A protein has these predicted regions:
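ATPase nucleotide-binding head domains, primarily ABC-like/P-loop NTPase cores
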Residues: 38-39, 233, 303-304, 314, ...
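Charged, surface-exposed helical/loop "interaction arms" that form contiguous linear patches used
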Residues: 364, 368, 378-381, 399, ...
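Amphipathic heptad-repeat alpha-helical coiled-coil/stalk segments that mediate oligomerization
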Residues: 207-215, 219-222, 271-274, 286, ...
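Charged catalytic and DNA/RNA-contacting regions of genome-maintenance
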Residues: 2-334, 350, 354-363, 367-459, ...
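Active-site phosphate-binding and catalytic loops of NTP-dependent enzymes
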Residues: 90, 113-122, 254, 390-396, ...
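Amphipathic alpha-helical coiled-coil segments
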Residues: 325, 332, 342-348, 375, ...
Length: 875
């Protein structure tokens, strides 16, 4: 970077502003372009694929430079922000005609991934959160906001795992934090690389507790924190204050649209850890990260962007409060029973624009006249929606009707003031309706009639002078003038004042034309200025009503979400679940909500499920791969989750005991980036489940122990089942799929464990998966048959059958003995003891004396060979 002393005055100004904003790419306004210089130009030209040029800057070498036109800045800005850059918008803040020297410029806004308000780059159906995390001595404060909608929340928590779960739940675009969080052990590479979250630490002064409280009180205009419900969230208060400080520094505005903050406890909602969210594919699929194929894809048939975001939030945060869940059920029941009412509502909801994000544009003073028309056309629909809701008598919908403010005064203001098809620009007139403001009407008449005045003057001058082709013309340099061709210049009278001589004509003016031009041009300038001033006043009026508009937007979102749930329930034959506090999960003819959408002709096979907290805690599920075990288990988890969202469920009947958490351990994939093997990842997830599950949790465990040797894997799986089923240790309701058929022996040994399997029909050497869960354990794995179905060559299949027969003849577990209950003093053994007393082999004593911990793997292997040779010699 160059030294400022050698630079031109303009470049010195640029360098001074850049010095104060080193972490930004600076968009420096120069006329009709935003220019970038030096390193910023090198970066931006590469990322935006635009031409890199140079500019004389006072140095020997030209400064690298690139630029983008101001009218197309959003698309370029969005590209940089989506790539994780911060962009500082540097505008001219004084009229160049009034400037003495260099035009004054300032940063008016810093755009970051979490503060981008451009609707071109944002997903209408998803919030764009900026999250702040404050870490101190093992405690954490989290605060996050969507500046485009005003959604603002905070909480405090006591573990990094909970912080991780919140990050996965809300998927912020950007995280700011203190330095302590950067060394907390969070997997930042995953957050950056897999979730595309931009993460940065901010200055320590942002996290000063006293300053944080003051920022909060100023923002929400309160004298203390009690009224905001923040007193019990000290860590959240610090995070919120830091977040507000960062927003004020980057947005350079008052942020008046951030009017409320919601302090919440994670215990208010079902806890679903990050792994379970991925495995259950709540909002996006595991494979391609798309909405299609997820639970949200099935449930979201909303008509508005606000409703889509609301419904997504409901899916992300299932409830645990029975009363709140039942309220949603009642609303859905009303809307499924009253089909005409529901469809009328959806018809009126469909044209409503995104009021929340329109309000943010009003707050940021970027709302254009067409945004105002979008507001008006949306508000026109509210009275009809309020009237339709009179037919709905359930508490939730009745309450929403009462809360729905039709905003008729705002609608009338916009109806009276803004023309139906206004321009985008706000400084070039053509915005305000005739009859709204007398001064504007008079100036419009002057502008319109001025053209007639010019035509009349032109005609008079032709008659007076005899110049038949005399015309009054206009350009920006001379304004209005009389144009006389050379063939008539001898007829020009003395009172004509020459302005310009051209090859074929002369240009003149007169006193009368000058006066008329002043009137016309002055009226046009005054008209544009007065229309702009009036438009700004209208926009400020809307800004003063933000709280009312925000409440109405929230009501519309809730109505839309409830109508979507009802529509989906009716179309897919979902039923209203019953809720119980006994902990029983009783599902009749349950179906997978997503899979049944993609299977043609109602071919999905439904299944029953019964789990409780006493005699039916653990269901061990055996059966071949591809038979449907994983689909069935996910199905049960999704039905429970849907029930607690407040949605109806895919089943003939369902009675659901409210669960506090759902954990899933499904599938395996090496976490190579962090150096963890498949088995290590599996065991870490199992450890997390066993540490954090409660007796009120639902566990979905698939193939525990398959990432290691057969006996180790079986041992671990066995021990996990014993631990989970023991009410003194855990006692959680669990679906446990396994290929270890030995685990079926636990039925009868542990009262709360029962066997189930996937029914299979054998047809010679072939099998047919019936997809039906039946009682009892599978007697075969059918692995060879599955391999055949998968297309493995016949030669391999035939050889596999031979090997399978040989192994069956030497069954290693045929002598397994009874397993003692968990916790008894004696070690458990998988091998049945002989009834006859046995003599210890001499090698056993020798082996017992060996210190294996001092042996290298090679030494241990050599020792094993020695023992083997001795045994062979004995034979």
């Amino acid at each position: 970077m160059a030294k400022k002393g050698k630079l031109t005055p303009m470049m010195q100004q640029y360098m001074q502003i850049k010095e104060e904003n080193k972490d930004c790419i600076l968009f420096y306004r120069l006329g009709d372009f935003y220019e970038m210089f030096f390193d910023d130009a090198l970066t931006a030209s590469k990322e935006l694929e635009i031409t890199l040029t140079g500019k004389n800057c006072g140095l020997e070498e030209r400064a690298p430079m690139c630029g983008v036109p101001y009218h197309a800045v959003d698309s370029y800005l969005n590209k940089l922000v989506e790539k994780g850059y911060k962009v500082g918008i540097c505008e001219q803040v004084e009229d160049p005609s009034q400037a003495k020297g260099i035009v004054k410029r300032e940063i008016v806004r810093i755009v970051t991934p979490g503060t981008n308000i451009s609707q071109q780059s944002l997903d209408d159906e998803k919030n764009n959160y900026l999250m702040c995390i404050f870490a101190s001595d093992g405690s954490y404060g989290i605060s996050f906001v969507d500046v485009t909608t005003g959604d603002f929340r905070t909480t405090s928590m006591d573990s990094l795992a909970k912080v991780r779960d919140e990050i996965f739940k809300f998927e912020p675009a950007e995280i700011i934090c203190n330095d302590a969080f950067l060394i907390s052990g969070m997997d930042f590479d995953y957050l950056k690389d897999k979730m595309s979250i931009v993460i940065s630490s901010i200055e320590p002064y942002h996290f000063d507790e006293e300053q944080a409280e003051e920022r909060i009180k100023r923002q929400f205009k309160v004298g203390n924190l009690e009224g905001l419900g923040l007193v019990d969230y000290p860590m959240g208060v610090i995070a919120t204050g830091a977040l507000l400080g960062y927003l004020h520094e980057t947005q350079k505005s008052s942020l008046d649209h951030l009017m409320h903050i919601d302090a919440y406890e994670t215990s208010e909602f079902m806890i679903i850890d990050s792994s379970s969210r991925r495995n259950l594919e709540l909002c996006e699929t595991l494979r391609d990260k798309q909405k299609k194929g997820s639970l949200l894809w099935v449930l979201d048939k909303t008509k508005t962007a606000m409703g889509a975001r609301m419904l997504r939030n409901m899916v992300e945060q299932p409830l645990v409060d029975k009363k709140k869940i039942e309220e949603r059920y009642d609303a859905i029941t009303t809307l499924t029973n009253q089909t005409i009412v529901r469809e009328e509502l959806r018809e009126y909801l469909n044209p409503i624009y995104d009021l929340e994000r329109l309000m943010t544009k009003v707050s940021y003073k970027t709302a254009n006249p067409r945004d105002m028309i979008a507001f008006k056309t949306s508000l026109e629909l509210l009275p009809a929606i309020k009237t339709i809701l009179e037919e709905c008598k359930d508490p939730l919908l009745s309450g929403l009707r009462e809360d729905l403010d039709p905003l008729e005064d705002i609608h009338d203001l916009l109806e009276d003031s803004i023309i139906e098809e206004p321009p985008l620009a706000i400084k070039e007139g053509g915005i305000i309706k005739e009859g709204f403001k007398d001064d504007i009407d008079q100036l419009k008449r002057a502008k319109t009639e001025g053209k007639q005045w010019l035509m009349e003057l032109e005609e008079r001058e032709r008659e007076k002078t005899g110049i038949k082709n005399l015309k009054i013309k206009y350009n920006k340099v001379f304004g209005y003038y009389l144009d006389v061709t050379n063939s008539y210049k001898d007829l020009v009278p003395n009172y004509y004042i020459r302005k310009q001589t051209l090859a074929n004509s002369e240009r003149y003016t007169t006193e009368e034309l000058n006066q008329l031009a002043d009137t016309i041009l002055g009226s046009e300038d005054r008209l544009y200025a007065l229309e702009y001033e009036t438009y700004v006043t209208i926009r400020e009026t809307l800004a003063g009503e933000m709280e009312r508009i925000s409440r109405t937007a929230n009501v519309i979102a809730q109505i839309d979400a409830m109508a979507s749930f009802a529509y989906v329930a009716e179309r897919n034959h979902f039923v209203r679940p019953k809720l119980n506090v006994r902990g029983t999960i009783d599902i009749k003819d349950g179906r997978h909500p997503v899979v049944e959408q993609v299977i043609p002709n109602d071919m999905f096979i439904s299944n029953d499920t019964y789990l409780d907290n006493k005699k039916n805690r653990v269901a061990i599920i055996t059966g071949p791969n591809m038979a449907g075990k994983s689909t069935y288990m996910r199905q049960v988890a999704l039905i429970v989750l849907m029930a607690q969202i407040g949605s109806f469920v895919p089943a003939a009947k369902a009675n659901i005991g409210i669960v506090d958490r759902i954990f899933t351990r499904v599938g395996a994939s090496d976490d190579l980036a962090s150096g963890q093997s498949t088995f290590m990842v599996e065991m870490s997830e199992v450890a997390n489940i066993l540490r954090n599950a409660t007796k009120n949790s639902l566990l979905i465990l698939d193939e525990i122990g398959r990432g290691t040797s057969t006996f180790d894997g079986l041992s671990i799986a066995w021990a996990v089942v014993e631990y989970i089923s023991n009410s003194k240790l855990l006692g959680a309701k669990t679906l446990f799929a396994t290929h270890y058929h030995e685990l079926t022996e636990l039925e009868g040994k542990i009262d709360s464990v029962h066997n189930y399997c996937i029914a299979v029909k054998e047809q010679g050497d072939d099998i047919v998966f019936l997809r039906k869960i039946v009682k009892g354990g599978a007697d075969k794995s059918y692995g060879v048959q599955v391999a055949k179905l998968a297309g493995v060559p016949d030669a391999v299949i035939n050889r596999a059958k031979e090997i399978a027969r040989e192994l069956e003849e030497h069954d290693l577990t045929s002598g397994a003995k009874d397993i003692m209950p968990y916790g008894e003093a004696q070690q458990l053994s998988f091998f049945r003891e002989s009834d006859e007393p046995t003599m210890e082999h001499p090698f056993m004593a020798e082996l017992r004396e060996k210190d294996l911990s001092d042996m290298t793997p090679l030494e241990a292997l050599n020792y094993l060979y020695v023992l083997q040779e001795k045994l062979k010699n004995e034979e």
